[in-house]
Each structure stands twice: as structure tokens, then as C-alpha cells.
Amino acid sequence: MIGIQEAAKAMIAAGTKGKIINTASIAGRTGYADWAPYCASKFAVVALTHAGARALAGKGITVNAFAPGVVATPLWEQLDKDLMAMGVSSAPGEAMENFSSSILLGRVAEPSDVVGTVRFLASPASDYMTGQVLMIDGGMILQ
């Protein structure tokens, strides 16, 4: 919320239109029992994206978000270790494999899969959209 407020404040003070791009997650669209606090924080990002879009559209500022699913990053490597420590999984890589088994495209995302969406949101091609959350999950939680 502070990021949206400060970015909007700077754009308004400069008299410019602009784009605010938030980072959500698939966890902001569906709840996961073992990750309730994380899910709550990402549901909040989605709600703040919607609220920010409504509040700032009249100032020429768009507010959108991207919501990655399982992305091959150090965060997921750590999460895999954490889930083993919690007893949710019993072998390295098992949690990530189980969690990503429902990805319709059959693989986890690479960071490069996310970059194109973020570039689109930052580009003039997205000028006529606001309040949207773009899922980058390979169809994992198809809605």
C-alpha cells in the first residue's frame, strides 16, 4: 500500500501520468492451507490493485499486477527446504514437484516467462487497462 501511495504521490506532484505494477501471486487467487499468512498478503495485493485502480484512474495512473505461479527461483528452492522441515514433504524437490503437477503447460515457469508480462504492463500496449491481475502460472489455477 505504501508503495502505491508513494508512487502515486510522486506522479501527481510531477504532473505526469503513469503506471503502477504490483507483484501478486497465484496465492492471491486461491488459498493454500500451509501458507495462510502468505496467501492473505497476496490477496491484499490484489485488493489494493483494484482499489488503487479505482482511486487513481482519474489522475491518469493505471494500477495493475502480475501473479506468478511456480517459478524456478531461489525462493522456491528455499520453500522446498522449508516444507521438508515442516514435514510436508520428505525429499528434496518433492514439494515443488507435487505443487507444480497441476500446471497445464507441464513445467514450472522460468524468470524469463514472467519478464514479458511485466514489460507489457510497463508498455504503452497496456495503456487502456487498469485494475487487472495477470496470471503467469501455465494454467495452474485456471479461472
Predicted regions and their residues:
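Residue(s) in the substrate-gating loop at a strand-loop-helix junction
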Residues: S25
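Short, small/polar-rich loop/turn modules that mediate ligand/substrate recognition or access, typified
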Residues: A57, T62, M129-G131
